[in-house]
From Swiss-Prot:
Entry's induction text: Highly up-regulated during growth on D-threitol relative to growth on glycerol.
Protein name, entry field: D-threitol-binding protein
Signal sequence segment: 1-22
Record membrane topology: Lipid-anchor
Organism expressing this protein natively: Mycolicibacterium smegmatis (strain ATCC 700084 / mc(2)155)
Family statement: Belongs to the bacterial solute-binding protein 2 family.
Lipidation residue positions, type S-diacylglycerol cysteine: C23
GO cellular component: plasma membrane
Positions with a binding annotation for D-threitol: Y42, N121, R173, N224, D249, Q269
């Protein structure tokens, strides 16, 4: 997703509480109806940047003040950020965690003080969370691996670019990939390693694999689009074209890669929709309103057949999509399908 000046400022921040407030949210001291919600994310990836736009739009429409933090992939930084938000007395906390097995003391502290803490997009290993808004990453991993298996005709050599090791997205997407690989004994994994969701790290990782395996690499399975795009860059710089690549997330550059044929497909995890849904759940919990506390985001497969509509939502008609986001999110919470946005292949709830 496009990274503007604000996004770069967020990504570079390592201090606690960046204090970015949603436009129009208002001053909580002047308006007692304002809900103050703290947010800490693992990093400002393309996916999270798109998600921030969605959360800001939902916050503006619902009188929510957002206090944004980026942990820059550091567990201790994220723990300090959550501690700070608890001390500030926010009404709810949203966490996109660096690691699944982190933040146990902070989760317990938030619960003890009556502050709903909701992991969104990446899970926390805790029974004390107030809600849980997660994608089905196992299904997404299986979906992308099945795309690759179909393209390879059930045999060939692949490399796998993983997310940060130990993060729930990496663990579950790996599980889904392995489930499909078990059905195809003639597909061999030459190498797999993390590139931490980052495009630049994937470029370097892929160049090393190209040096080591050369033409043996028949396909690249990337656990997100950014890493797939890094692999694509490395392949092109090495003079290799036509190597099938599949990703997950459906960020702008990933969707364009599907349209151009550089990717065989992706799975749309529209951060704008998913993180806004997480905010809606946290907001209702903070207000004591009824809500499904554990909705699941099911990613639709994106191929050349339906990529144009996804591009409209993520890129070319984005403002129109953002303008209708609150209505979409609220309707999706009622139907239970928080991923629905009218992509061809999605079933109307």
């Amino acid at each position: 997703m496009r990274l503007g000046t604000t996004a770069f400022a967020i990504a570079s921040a390592t201090a606690l509480g960046l204090g970015l407030t949603a436009c129009g949210a208002g001053d909580p001291a002047a308006n007692s109806d304002t809900t103050r919600i703290g947010v800490t994310v693992y990093d400002m990836s393309s996916f999270i940047t798109a998600g921030k736009e969605g959360m800001d739009a939902y916050a503006k429409d619902n009188n929510i003040e957002l206090i944004w933090n980026s942990a820059n992939l550091d567990v201790s930084t994220q723990a300090s950020q959550v501690d700070s938000m608890i001390n500030q007395g926010v009404d709810a906390i949203i966490v996109v965690p660096v690691q699944a097995d982190s933040l146990a003391p902070q989760v317990a502290s938030a619960k003890a003080k009556g502050i709903p803490l909701v992991p969104v997009n990446a899970a926390l290993d805790s029974k004390d969370i107030a809600g849980n808004v997660q994608p089905d990453d196992v299904a997404a991993g299986a979906q992308e691996m099945q795309m690759m298996a179909d393209r390879l005709g059930g045999k060939g050599n692949i490399v796998i670019l993983q997310g940060p090791l130990g993060q729930s997205g990496e663990l579950d997407r790996s599980k889904g990939i392995e489930q499909v690989l078990a059905k195809y004994p003639d597909i061999k994994v030459l190498a797999k390693d993390t590139a931490n969701w980052k495009r630049d790290e994937a470029v370097n990782k892929m160049k090393n694999w190209i040096s080591g395996f050369g033409p043996q690499i028949d396909g690249v399975v990337a656990q997100n689009d950014d890493m797939g795009l890094g692999a694509l860059q490395a392949l092109k710089e090495s003079g290799r074209t036509g190597v099938p690549i599949v990703g997950i997330d459906g960020i702008e550059d990933g969707l364009n890669a599907v349209k151009s044929g550089d990717f065989i497909g992706t799975s749309l995890q529209n951060g704008t929709v998913e993180l806004a849904a997480g905010l809606a759940v946290a907001n209702r919990l903070a207000k004591g309103e009824p809500v499904n506390k554990e909705p699941v985001y099911i990613m639709p497969a994106i191929t050349k057949d339906n990529v144009d509509v996804a591009i409209e939502h993520v890129v070319t008609e984005r403002q129109q999509f953002l303008d209708g986001l609150t209505e979409l999110i609220n309707k999706n919470l009622e139907t239970g399908d928080i991923a629905y946005e009218g992509i061809p292949g999605q079933k109307q709830p």
